[in-house]
Amino acid sequence: MTGSDNKTIVRRFIEKIENTGDVSNIHEFISEDYVEVHDGKRYQIGIKGAIDHVLGVRKVFPDLKLTIENQITEGEWVVTIYSVTGTFKEAWFGMKPTGKPITFTGVNVDRISNGKIVEHGGAANLLEPLMNEGVVIKKE
């Protein structure tokens, strides 16, 4: 597959799965042995774990809209720079919801093999938006 093909797989996953919350076709995008990478650790969560992740995020932000700002490819890897808007409706990592819209940016790094996402990691810039909403209090 080409870099362009790999970008399309990630873009379609964002449009068809993450932005809608409809996980019925997630198997078309995510491999059986799908791995999430966080804090330098690898977690093989498979399709079931990916479904739980998507539904969990959409519970917190039910109107989530992820917009791709740019994508870069290198071999099997796709880097996606994105922005997100969504209403903060449920508690998240111990933070109380505000019921207000929030906007933040982030970067995802996905590895594609045999036409499916096999590995995912990334980082989201949530500190400033959460401070602006009073969810995270900055020390004076």
Residues covered by each model-derived region:
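C-terminal and inter-domain tail/linker signature
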Residues: 1-140
